[in-house]
């Protein structure tokens, strides 16, 4: 697989690269996020989209409950940004990493131990964009470092709207 340049310095893909372009372009998706209503769990997840090496999710953490436990991921780094509410992130020994409000956040690299909780007066809506280190492995490699406060597999799960509002 190679890319040659024409005389104008423009990349000209070979046949294999062109196949990759076409395959990738066939999976481009748009989305629109709206907070779901009617969830019964203390936590919800709205899946916005994913590819082989990146995932986008909005986590909704209700005021009473839904906080997670100290953990890390062996196969994913995450970028976190608060959309609504307030969050406090902690590291080992409950050391505060930071408190964040709308349009603020943090980045947690692979193997960094952390947990977070909703510290606002309303539900927390937080965007998580995860970059996966091994595209062949669909798991983030979540590994608990302390007992779970909230059973993560009991959260309400939703799919984001694929076509954006017009």
Annotate each language-model stretch with its function.
Residues 1-55, 69-70, 142-166:
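A short, N-terminal "cap"/entry segment at the start of jelly-roll beta-barrel domains
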Residues 30, 58-60, 79, 105-107:
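Conserved hydrophobic/aromatic beta-strand scaffold that supports enzyme active sites
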Residues 52-53, 75, 94, 121-122:
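Short strand-connecting beta-turns/loops that link adjacent beta-strands
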Residues 59-63, 72-89, 129-132:
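Short, conserved beta-strand element in jelly-roll/cupin
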Residues 79, 107, 121-140:
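A short hydrophobic beta-strand segment most commonly corresponding to one strand
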Residues 94-110:
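Short acidic-glycine-tyrosine-enriched beta hairpin
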Residues 112-115:
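Short, charged beta-turn/beta-strand-edge "cap" motif at the junction between a beta-strand
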Residues 117-119:
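Asparagine-centered strand-capping/turn motif at beta-strand->loop junctions
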């Amino acid at each position: 697989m190679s890319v040659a340049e024409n005389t104008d310095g423009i990349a000209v893909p070979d046949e294999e690269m062109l196949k990759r372009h076409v395959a990738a372009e066939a999976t481009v998706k748009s989305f629109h996020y709206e907070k779901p209503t009617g969830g019964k769990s203390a936590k919800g997840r709205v899946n916005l989209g994913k590819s082989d090496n990146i995932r986008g999710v909005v986590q909704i953490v209700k005021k009473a409950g839904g906080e997670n436990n100290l953990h890390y991921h062996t196969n994913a780094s995450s970028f976190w940004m608060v959309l609504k509410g307030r969050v406090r992130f902690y590291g080992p020994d409950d050391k505060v990493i930071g408190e964040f409000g709308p349009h603020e956040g943090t980045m947690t690299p692979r193997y960094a131990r952390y947990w977070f909780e909703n510290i606002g007066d309303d539900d927390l809506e937080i965007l998580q964009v995860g970059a996966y280190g091994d595209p062949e492995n669909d798991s983030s490699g979540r590994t608990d470092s302390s007992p779970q406060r909230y059973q993560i597999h009991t959260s309400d799960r939703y799919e984001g709207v694929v076509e954006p509002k017009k």
